[in-house]
């Protein structure tokens, strides 16, 4: 059964990161995550500054930024996150053994654990991936970090369903503080065992139904009523012919109204 608790009630979460996220969602009245996949630092920062007031979370693919640097990309991005009060989710989709992901998360060119509040991982390599990522976070920063497991995807033909999804949920159960939830298309349960997982859902659109590369879109009401806590929207916010200011408020309101409808159903 989908939870009808308010974000304020859920801010008693055992994870400091989840607690912070629920609190800012309530204070800003938004459950919108902007997925900003652009190729330059200038485009990224400009869009984030515009969308910042409407979002609780920014989702990045930092490895597609052609002119990336910690100084010119990450530093100003962190300043914008403070100015507009949102968290940062690096959509890295880790998928290797624990020792390897530990190095990938903490080091390399992107040093993700230093600046991203949240990251995510596939469950294909087993439980060691959670341990490796958590160790990297603890050894890199004193700031709280959170992990989302990829339980389901929005792309046509995805293998992330059935037994794979069930096993991924079992992996998430191994760490109540660090594993804060899932990338999924619906509620993942767990409340009977004391878990309050955050469900973030990609492939959400108010207008389009899909694209030529297999993306499939569902409506805001559809995903939130099914258990989604945070809607992830990309091209719907800033695609060709769209005004990010107008679309940011449009999706913020749609997401918040859908949440209030679910909450009022208790």
Swiss-Prot record:
Source domain of life is: Eukaryota
Q: Which GO terms describe its cellular component?
A: cytosol
Which GO molecular function terms does the record list? orotidine-5'-phosphate decarboxylase activity
Q: Which residues form the active site?
A: 93 (proton donor)
Q: Does the keyword Lyase apply?
A: yes
Q: Give the matching PROSITE patterns.
A: OMPDECASE (PS00156)
Gene Ontology biological-process annotations: 'de novo' pyrimidine nucleobase biosynthetic process; 'de novo' UMP biosynthetic process
Pathway of this protein? Pyrimidine metabolism; UMP biosynthesis via de novo pathway; UMP from orotate: step 2/2
Kindly indicate whether the keyword Signal belongs to this entry. Answer: no
Pfam families recorded: OMPdecase (PF00215)
Tell me which residues bind substrate: 37, 59-61, 91-100, 217, 235
Q: What is its EC number?
A: 4.1.1.23
Q: Which reaction does it catalyse?
A: orotidine 5'-phosphate + H(+) = UMP + CO2
Q: Which UniProt keywords apply?
A: Decarboxylase, Lyase, Pyrimidine biosynthesis
Task: Fetch the InterPro entries from UniProt.
Answer: Aldolase_TIM, OMPdecase, OMPdecase_AS, OMPdeCOase_dom, RibuloseP-bd_barrel
Gene3D superfamilies, alphabetically?
Aldolase class I
The UniProt similarity line reads: Belongs to the OMP decarboxylase family.
Protein name (database record) = Orotidine 5'-phosphate decarboxylase
Which species is the source of this protein?
Cyberlindnera jadinii (Torula yeast)
Q: What high-level taxonomic lineage is stated for the organism?
A: Eukaryota, Fungi, Dikarya, Ascomycota, Saccharomycotina
């Amino acid at each position: 059964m989908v939870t009808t608790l308010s974000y304020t009630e859920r801010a008693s979460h055992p994870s400091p990161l989840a607690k912070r996220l629920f609190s800012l969602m309530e204070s800003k009245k938004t459950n919108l995550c902007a997925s900003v996949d652009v190729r330059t630092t200038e485009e990224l920062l400009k869009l984030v500054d515009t969308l910042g007031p409407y979002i609780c979370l920014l989702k990045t693919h930092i490895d597609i930024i052609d002119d990336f640097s910690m100084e010119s990309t990450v530093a100003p991005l962190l300043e914008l996150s403070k100015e507009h009060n949102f968290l940062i989710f690096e959509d890295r989709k880790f998928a290797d053994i624990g020792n390897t992901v530990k190095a990938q998360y903490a080091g390399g060119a992107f040093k993700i654990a230093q600046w991203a509040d949240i990251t995510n991982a596939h469950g294909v390599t087993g439980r060691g991936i959670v341990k490796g990522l958590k160790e990297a976070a603890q050894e890199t920063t004193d700031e709280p970090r959170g992990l989302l497991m990829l339980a389901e995807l929005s792309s046509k033909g995805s293998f992330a369903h059935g037994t794979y999804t069930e096993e991924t949920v079992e992996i998430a159960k191994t760490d109540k503080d660090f594993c804060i939830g899932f990338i999924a298309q619906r509620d993942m349960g767990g409340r009977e065992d004391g878990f309050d997982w955050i469900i973030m859902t990609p492939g959400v659109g108010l207008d389009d139904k899909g694209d030529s590369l297999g993306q499939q879109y569902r409506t805001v009401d559809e995903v939130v009523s099914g258990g989604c806590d945070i809607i992830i929207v990309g091209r719907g916010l800033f695609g060709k012919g769209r005004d990010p200011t107008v679309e940011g408020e449009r999706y913020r309101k749609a997401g918040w109204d859908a949440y209030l409808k679910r909450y009022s159903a208790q």
